[in-house]
Regions:
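Short juxtamembrane and helix-loop transition motifs at transmembrane-helix boundaries
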Residues: 1-5, 64-74, 93-103
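Hydrophobic transmembrane alpha-helical segments in integral membrane proteins
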Residues: 1-18, 134-138
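Hydrophobic alpha-helical transmembrane segments of multi-pass membrane proteins
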Residues: 9-63, 74-87, 109-121, 171-193
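Alpha-helical transmembrane segments in multipass membrane proteins, preferentially the mid-helix core
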Residues: 19-24, 88-93, 121-122, 141-169, ...
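Transmembrane helix-loop junctions in multipass membrane proteins, especially transporters and channels
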Residues: 28-31, 57-64, 94-100, 124-128, ...
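Non-cytosolic membrane-interface motifs at loop->transmembrane helix junctions
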Residues: 64-76, 128-140, 194
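Membrane-proximal helix-loop-helix units in multi-pass membrane proteins
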Residues: 82-150
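Membrane-helix boundary/juxtamembrane motif in polytopic membrane proteins
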Residues: 101-108, 131-136, 152-180
Length: 194
């Protein structure tokens, strides 16, 4: 089973890197910023996977408490990478909505970063601390999805409504996946910790 998980993780890492490179190549030919932002998301995910992979490798053949399985190792790096990843996702949403305000970009990202830092500093370490830390990402993604739909609903621009409507299926699938991640984290971290 360990060998299977090793190759699974390695495959995900390779897919992230290849997708990031392909996104950059697509940007080079199309000049659509969307592809730069998408590449950024995949690069951030690859960095995070590498950090997890490294942590698991260094603890190989060493016993550690089951409660540490979802521990927040290297919280500064992890928080900065998560914030960068969320920033790229937010840039994709802003690009979809044709929004270009620096203030609109900074406020949600700063709020996410401050929320993560507050959880690290203010919540006592334990399962609830871990669950809140990881769930903030899903909370941010829910915010992004709701903001997209709210902006499209409120808009009088037919083109914007059509653009968002074209992405409706992807946004719904994303919302379902976010719900699954929250349920999985809730179950694995709070209900039956390893």
């Amino acid at each position: 089973m360990n060998t299977l998980m090793f190759f699974y993780t390695l495959a995900i890492l390779v897919i992230c890197i290849v997708t990031a490179v392909l996104s950059l190549a697509t940007y080079a030919s199309s000049r659509r910023r969307f592809f730069i932002y998408g590449s950024g998301v995949f690069i951030c995910y690859a960095i995070e996977m590498t950090e997890i992979f490294f942590f698991e490798y260094t603890l190989q053949n060493q016993s550690f408490p089951a409660s540490d399985y979802y521990s927040i190792t290297m919280p500064v790096l992890r928080t900065l990478v998560a914030t960068a990843s969320q920033a790229f996702i937010w840039l994709i949403a802003m690009d979809l909505l044709d929004k270009h305000s620096k203030k609109l970009f900074v406020i949600p990202i700063a709020t996410f970063l401050l929320s993560e830092l507050l959880i690290i500093v203010a919540i006592p370490y334990g399962p609830m601390h871990q669950w809140l830390y990881y769930t903030m990402r899903q909370v941010f993604l829910v915010f992004v999805g709701l903001y997209i739909f709210w902006t499209a609903h409120k808009s009088t621009k037919v083109e914007l409504k059509a653009r968002v409507n074209n992405q409706k299926k992807h946004l719904i699938i994303g919302a379902i996946l976010v719900g699954c991640i929250v349920a999985e984290d809730f179950y694995n971290i709070l209900v039956v910790p390893m």
